[in-house]
Amino acid sequence: MAIISSLANHLLIAMPSLKDPNFERSVVYLCEHNEQGSVGLIINRPLQFPLSIVFEQLQIEPIRVEKNGLPLLFGGPVQPERGFVIHKQMGGWRSSLFLQDEVTVTTSNDIIRAIAYDEGPKDVLITLGYAAWTEQQLEREIMSNTWLVCPYKSEILYEVPFEERWEYAGLTLGIKMNQLSSDAGHA
């Protein structure tokens, strides 16, 4: 069995026992995991307002009306005013972090303008806020059965409907999430 030294570029799946409203039934893409802590983005929690709100705030008039309807996602409780665009292709954006072949995270407004003008990446998720864990906090939560760890799957990030991602991520591990007990315990 291989030992994983970093959980970066993995997915966290909230166990049914996790009742924190910020993380209940969430799937988190881990952008960073090291000895200082972890940072991730929740990828299955659409907010009640669309991207058109961001376009209005930035005074952008999108070329294609359907861009207005792109959902914004709740990325986590830390800095909820801060936006993150998860996308496949690189590009010349001002502030991008390449994480792996299919995942780049950009935080600069130029990518939002490109999306509005139909010049941005095809596959995108736009989140507000992020999740963070202090040193060893995530490891303790995993050991206490708060999270399952799933290898990255492109379809979970870009194709599976938001409301199905939690169950789908579990199925990639052979687990039916709705059949797990919300009671924590150890055998």
From Swiss-Prot:
Pfam families, per the entry: DUF179
Entry GO terms, CC: cytosol
Family: Belongs to the UPF0301 (AlgH) family.
Protein name in UniProt: UPF0301 protein lpg0586
Organism: Legionella pneumophila subsp. pneumophila (strain Philadelphia 1 / ATCC 33152 / DSM 7513)
